[in-house]
Design a protein with these regions (language model features):
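A short acidic, Gly/Pro-enriched loop at the edge of an enzyme's catalytic core
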Residues: 207-218
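A short glycine-rich, Lys/Arg-flanked "PGG" loop and its adjoining helix->strand segment in the class I
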Residues: 234-261
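Conserved alpha-helix/loop element of class I SAM-dependent methyltransferases that forms part
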Residues: 121-144
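Conserved SAM-binding loop of SAM-dependent methyltransferases across substrates and taxa
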Residues: 154-165
């Protein structure tokens, strides 16, 4: 017997027994059920996280970044469509323009406000720690300054930085992001600044290089430029690696050119603990700079920090964000963690 039918008949029998008993028993008052409060989601969840992070955020820049969550808008649900390989994503409007046969091969993906702000990478407020690091090394940003995020991953932190008055550019190769952030208001003016989103390989594609432009006060890359992804020193599955499509010298020259004189570049990588030698290699566990000190220097940069450890601060942040209590994928932030950053500067 199907489970639904069993449940239906059980419920019916229970109702009949209750009806018979009710005629012989005095009426009783059933206390109302307590409905638990809905868990904050989307922009509200980020505002809640900001309150938790504020007491451990050390810089004015970080505090302003958290406070800007008050300006994050609510976002209406939207639907994306992807092919079976997930190499191509379409907006609802783009999918509607396809032939019936093409549309039938697509899978729909429902995007709520939480997915809009977090995509598949979790809270964008994890950027607050890199901002604290930058401030501790003397970085100051003025309204109108340009900020570039290489491999931005989600739009939330870009909007927060734009709310502070910065002109922010995010570049990424993930085809989902192009479709996800294609509605009016996803980019453009935001607060006192602006958000520009570019989809394509930087610096391999000259058109993307031209669109990125120059004059940046800050270039930041979080969890993308890892040695394990780009120059693994152990065998790794090629599908988990990143091919920048150019020599290291050419890549570093392109980053150098984006910065204004005196501009700063930060690589900040939060990783699981480095894979032991007797275990299969996990590329994203090696968060060291993919570029050597000699390569940075040859490109013209001044190296301020190379593979500096930052575990304690991120452990604290991770607990406040609940990474260790995630019901689907709890992270052992006490033991299974590595955090490294590299900070370089273009001479003024």
């Amino acid at each position: 017997m199907p489970l639904q039918e069993v449940m239906r008949r059980t419920a019916l029998a229970t109702s009949l027994v209750a009806l018979a008993l009710s005629s012989a028993c005095a009426p009783t008052t059933t206390p109302p059920k307590t409905i638990p409060a809905a868990k904050p989601a989307g922009a509200e969840a980020l505002r809640d996280e900001a309150k938790r992070l504020a007491p451990v955020t050390s810089s004015a820049l970080g505090q302003h970044f958290l406070a800007a969550t008050a300006e994050l808008p609510h976002v209406a649900p939207r639907t994306l469509f992807a092919d079976s390989s997930k190499a191509h994503y379409f907006t609802a409007r783009e999918a509607a323009a396809l032939s019936p046969a093409e549309r039938s091969a697509l899978k729909s993906i429902e995007i709520d406000e939480e997915s809009y702000y977090e995509t598949k990478y979790g809270s964008p407020l994890s950027y607050v720690r890199p901002l604290d690091v930058l401030a501790a090394h003397g970085l100051t940003l003025a309204k109108g300054d340009r900020v570039l995020d290489f491999g931005y991953g989600y739009v939330g932190h870009l909007r927060l930085l734009a709310t502070l008055g910065f002109r922010v550019t995010g570049v990424d190769v993930d085809p989902m992001l192009r479709a996800l952030y294609s509605e009016p208001g996803d980019s453009g003016n935001a607060g006192g600044g602006s958000v520009t989103l570019l989809n394509g390989p930087f610096p391999k594609d000259p058109k993307i290089v031209e669109a990125v432009g120059t004059g940046y006060a800050l270039v930041i890359s979080k969890n993308v430029l890892k040695r394990g992804y780009i120059h693994p020193d152990r065998p790794a599955d090629p599908k988990h690696l990143i091919d920048l499509g150019m020599t290291d010298d050419a890549v570093l020259a392109a980053f150098f050119a984006t910065l204004r004189p005196g501009g700063t570049m930060l690589i900040y990588n939060i990783c699981p603990a480095l894979s032991p030698p007797d275990k299969p290699f996990v590329p994203w566990s090696d968060g060291r700079s993919p570029f050597t000190r000699e390569a940075w220097t040859a490109a013209g940069f001044v190296v301020l920090e190379l593979d500096r450890d930052d575990i304690p601060a991120v452990q604290q942040m991770a607990r406040l964000l609940g990474w260790d209590k995630d019901p689907d994928d709890p992270w052992d932030v006490e033991h299974d963690i590595s955090v490294l950053y590299t900070l370089v500067k273009r001479p003024g």
